[in-house]
């Protein structure tokens, strides 16, 4: 998830396609280059992990407008453009998992997103992310 978030974040400001970025970043060489920057890059992903990362990044890219619409809808009092890019990437990945990966429980997707956010964002932004994801699940999946 964390690598998928990094790549989704990178897609938000580069002109690369999701496929090209994945092909460039999911290599042993790329991981070796990034290993000193972040511990998540200590070892290149195996085939199963790489497939999961690809599914997330390609799905988030394909459904970006829909996911951003949900973020905008539940970010009460915030314009989407004001939300930090990392926070947006975290929420996009979690929402994609919730909407399109039914084998992942909603609570797990939210918890993982919040834990990753704690590594990169301020406590206030972590609460903001948790609040948006919680509202999204409560409202969109109300029985």
Predicted segment positions?
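N-terminal interaction/assembly modules
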Residues: 1-126, 130-143
